């Protein structure tokens, strides 16, 4: 009986630990608290549609640019986020996407398209196949792709 009790206790402990890990890994709700300090909503300029079309073409993915809620932190080169300093930040939670761009980069095709690619792939991380090989949307691969 002691062995059975010990096994049940170990199982309960493992399940509780798994639940805590899952909660820690699950993104929180997208909303004002998930945005960098100073973020304000903005309407994407018409140029973003051209960049979206290019990003769809290079990635072979499709999506709806209009479904993204856009934010910027005006007057900054880097935004302070809970995951470090960023020039762009893609978040998806509860079926809603937000993209926040540092104010100095709202007109930067590389930065904006990089965040668009996250949306088209619906994922964090930077799979080399898409971000480097297909689309050239990293600082190092951008110059090669754009011919600069």
Locations of the language-model features?
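Short active-site segment of divalent metal-dependent hydrolases/proteases
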Residues: 113, 117-121
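Auxiliary, metal-adjacent structural segments of Zn-dependent hydrolase domains
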Residues: 28-106, 148
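C-terminal motif of bacterial Sec signal peptides marking the signal peptidase cleavage site
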Residues: 22-24
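Processing junctions and N-termini across compartments
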Residues: 19, 51-52, 129
